[in-house]
Amino acid sequence: MSLFDFFKNKGSAATATDRLKLILAKERTLNLPYMEEMRKEIIAVIQKYTKSSDIHFKTLDSNQSVETIEVEIILPR
């Protein structure tokens, strides 16, 4: 589902499905209260060893039991 999918005309079933997916994705992140603390700790460790402040987290894939997060680190030359 991309950002542009929200602006297309589609049926009510497809709209309801998209809304449900967004709600479920949000609820999954709410069920993991340690996730934000873990991100802060990862940033602290990366900054300690690389002196980089350009760190980005991306959630790639989520299902009922696994959430995959990608960390992008821009290293200075």
Swiss-Prot record:
InterPro entries: MinE, MinE_sf. This is Cell division topological specificity factor. Belongs to the MinE family. Keywords: Cell cycle, Cell division. Prevents the cell division inhibition by proteins MinC and MinD at internal division sites while permitting inhibition at polar sites. This ensures cell division at the proper site by restricting the formation of a division septum at the midpoint of the long axis of the cell. The lineage of its organism: Bacteria, Pseudomonadati, Campylobacterota, Epsilonproteobacteria, Campylobacterales. One of its GO terms (biological process) is cell division. It comes from the Bacteria.
